């Protein structure tokens, strides 16, 4: 039985305690976020498609962990079988470390190793991942002609059936992984000793809790930190926060002695103490729409960014408008378009003055949204939204904002609140509409999971109905927020 795997090795590089907890106390992990679930699904889909770059291979994936020893042996048998040209998820084990290599291709008397990533850029984690796999392969005596990372080509434009040879790019990392072999060997021995400890290693909370990824044991490791601690401030980076923490600054009162009294940092700590929000009203009001608009609409876009382009003329992760809701402040008519037969009761989704459109049933219709938005937005002077994306850029990209009939100004509450240093203890490290609703109105009606799933994969049928409801609810929250600060 193996001790380390690719995922546990990477986790151990980030934090020894997190590695120990995952191996010995996995039940203490935080609940897997919906974002992570969607990301895993996307990675799996891209990995399967990548097999077509080297077709005709044998899938070595085990059905359960109990099959690992069997699959290791089968992999070895295939290495010596000249009839086997390609293997997917080939299983190797060396020095108590197990890997499953995405693609292994016979290359004369040697083998080409390929690890697939669903991103358009390669990160340090991906290189560390490859270095571990090379360490195991080399330790097993597998002769390699090259080791490559395969990732999505951001310049690829779909023109007919997906051309996998053009969709993916490959980068040789052979030189890098050879240079890192000694480093990997040292870490493997160190991390095996960590796992063998009779108790978890004494590792304090620190910058590693969120770098390079948010740790899924924060709920356990941070349980003794007060919920209103200055460590949850966003006005200071983690380096500064933990530098003070390790120097004995353990309370908000002590932290206030280290910073300027009227600074953003101080105001955030006061908000933590009183469980209230802080905003710089001087900045906020300087950003207010001028002159006061006579007609206002609240726009909510649900964008879909498929890793593998679905429609002609699109690129990997290129956004398309999957749905939108438009709420006019003084409209009294309601209309809903595109009702698929699989969604009974859809007409009940109409809210007073709200227009909802989607193409869940047929993504090829997504450009209809552009014509609809050009026509409907032309009736307003101000279009208000709440999105981390730059909505003006999105509208420009799709020629919505350049249309001559459009004379409105886009007002993104997300950007405005951030510029005005809005902060609330419930928001902490991420401003979302759901958290904003809790902070300002002490209410939680919004279910954001459907939005996240649809933006990542757009194949969760159960989320469609919820997403339509959320589009309307989100606009209501945006309207309440705008009216709170600017009316």
Language-model regions, residue ranges each:
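Conserved DEDDh/DEDDy metal-dependent 3′-5′ exonuclease domain
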Residues: 84-90, 94, 98-102, 113-116, ...
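Short acidic-glycine loop/turn motifs at beta-strand connectors
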Residues: 106-110, 328-331
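Conserved RNase H-like, two-metal-ion catalytic cores of nucleic-acid enzymes
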Residues: 92, 284-376
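Flexible loop/turn segments at secondary-structure boundaries
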Residues: 28, 121, 156-157, 252, ...
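Helix-loop elements that line ligand-binding/catalytic pockets
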Residues: 203-212, 216-253, 278, 352, ...
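Metal-dependent nuclease catalytic cores that hydrolyze phosphodiester bonds in DNA/RNA
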Residues: 1-109, 239-272, 459-460, 473
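Acidic, Mg2+-coordinating catalytic module of metal-dependent nucleases/exonucleases
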Residues: 162-227, 441-487
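Long, highly charged low-complexity segments
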Residues: 252-308
């Amino acid at each position: 039985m193996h001790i380390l795997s690719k995922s546990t090795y990477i986790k151990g590089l980030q934090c020894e305690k997190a590695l120990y907890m995952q191996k010995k106390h996995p039940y203490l992990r935080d609940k897997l976020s919906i974002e992570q679930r969607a990301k895993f699904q996307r990675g799996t889909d891209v990995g399967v498609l990548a097999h077509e770059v080297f077709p005709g291979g044998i899938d070595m994936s085990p059905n359960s962990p109990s099959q690992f020893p069997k699959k290791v042996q089968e992999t070895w048998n295939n290495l010596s079988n000249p009839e086997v040209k390609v293997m997917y998820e080939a299983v190797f084990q060396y020095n108590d470390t197990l890997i499953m290599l995405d693609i292994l291709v016979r290359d004369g008397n040697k083998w080409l190793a390929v690890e697939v990533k669903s991103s358009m850029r390669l990160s340090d984690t991906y290189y560390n991942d490859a270095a571990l796999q090379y360490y195991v392969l080399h330790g097993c005596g597998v002769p390699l002609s090259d080791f490559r990372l395969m990732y999505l080509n951001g310049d690829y434009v779909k023109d007919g059936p997906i051309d996998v040879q053009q969709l993916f790019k490959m980068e040789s990392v052979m030189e890098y992984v050879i240079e890192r072999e000694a480093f990997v060997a040292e870490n493997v021995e160190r991390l095996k000793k960590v796992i063998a400890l009779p108790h978890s290693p004494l590792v304090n909370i620190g910058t590693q809790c969120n770098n390079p990824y948010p740790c899924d044991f924060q709920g356990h490791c941070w349980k003794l930190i007060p919920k209103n601690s200055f460590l949850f401030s966003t006005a200071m980076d983690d380096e500064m926060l933990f530098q003070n923490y390790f120097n004995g600054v353990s309370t908000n009162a002590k932290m206030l002695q280290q910073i300027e009294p009227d600074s953003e940092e101080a105001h955030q700590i006061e908000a933590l103490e009183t469980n209230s929000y802080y905003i710089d009203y001087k900045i906020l009001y300087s950003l207010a729409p001028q002159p006061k608009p006579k007609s206002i609409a609240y726009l909510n876009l649900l964008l879909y960014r498929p890793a593998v382009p679905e429609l002609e003329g699109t690129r990997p992760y290129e956004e398309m408008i999957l749905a939108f809701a438009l709420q006019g402040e003084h409209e009294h008519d309601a209309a809903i378009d595109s009702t698929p037969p699989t969604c009974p009761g859809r007409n009940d989704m109409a809210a007073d003055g709200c227009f909802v459109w989607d193409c869940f049933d047929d993504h090829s219709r997504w450009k209809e949204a552009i014509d609809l938005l050009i026509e409907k937005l032309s009736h307003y002077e101000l279009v208000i939204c709440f999105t981390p994306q730059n909505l003006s850029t999105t509208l420009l990209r799709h020629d919505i904002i350049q249309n001559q009939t459009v004379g409105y100004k886009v007002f993104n509450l997300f950007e405005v609140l951030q510029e005005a240093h809005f902060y609330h203890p419930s928001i902490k490290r991420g401003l979302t509409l759901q958290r904003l609703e809790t902070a300002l109105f002490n209410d939680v009606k919004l279910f954001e999971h459907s939005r996240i799933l649809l933006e990542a994969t757009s194949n969760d049928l159960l989320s469609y109905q919820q997403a339509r409801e959320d589009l309307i609810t989100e606009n209501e929250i945006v309207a309440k927020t705008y009216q709170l600060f600017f009316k």
